[in-house]
Amino acid sequence: MSRYRGPRFKKIRRLGALPGLTSKRPRAGSDLRNQSRSGKKSQYRIRLEEKQKLRFHYGLTERQLLKYVRIAGKAKGSTGQVLLQLLEMRLDNILFRLGMALTIPQARQLVNHGHILVNGRIVDIPSYRCKPRDIITVKDEQNSRTLVQNLLDSSAPEELPKHLTLHTFQYEGLVNQIIDRKCVGLKINELLVVEYYSRQT
């Protein structure tokens, strides 16, 4: 299954705010109206919607998300929390959280087009897993820096999560540590996502 490229507002109206997909927000009360039209949600649908929320926010295919769930299931600790850490530490998401891109698809384009370096080397793989002490910089070329500066100027000022530091004038971000669960930028019940996949096998 490919990445979603359809109308974004349609998705947030059904699933709620997806900041990685779009900065738009659902209208107040739209969730209640949708729920009243469709009646009480089944447990399956609740789990499915949480899974879809995660997939659309991070811009993943179904196969990619399943792969992350399997990796998280083999790791030590809570599968749900490990899953969120894996997704949050992707390079495209780190750029988004730093404010160098307005959405994760936009961050993915920056990476794909070779504008981003990690520890001094160009990385063109959006799924690259960042680690503590990684230094993310914009390529030292005018078109790359102008592009990112425009995005930084356009992004709404938000407090950075504790695991990241941004040096705006150096076009540089630093990964301080693995993200803490409370700093995840999406309202999600990750346990329902894990439960969804456990019932598919």
From Swiss-Prot:
InterPro entries: Ribosomal_uS4, Ribosomal_uS4_bac-type, Ribosomal_uS4_CS, Ribosomal_uS4_N, S4_RNA-bd, S4_RNA-bd_sf. It is found in: Plastid, Chloroplast. Residues 89-152 form the S4 RNA-binding domain. Coiled coil: none annotated. PROSITE patterns: RIBOSOMAL_S4, S4. Residues 20-44 are annotated as: Disordered. Keywords: Chloroplast, Plastid, Ribonucleoprotein, Ribosomal protein, RNA-binding, rRNA-binding. One of its GO terms (molecular function) is rRNA binding. One of its GO terms (biological process) is translation. GO terms for cellular component: chloroplast; small ribosomal subunit. One of the primary rRNA binding proteins, it binds directly to 16S rRNA where it nucleates assembly of the body of the 30S subunit. Part of the 30S ribosomal subunit. Contacts protein S5. The interaction surface between S4 and S5 is involved in control of translational fidelity. Belongs to the universal ribosomal protein uS4 family. This is Small ribosomal subunit protein uS4c. It comes from Aethionema cordifolium. The lineage of its organism: Eukaryota, Viridiplantae, Streptophyta, Embryophyta, Tracheophyta.
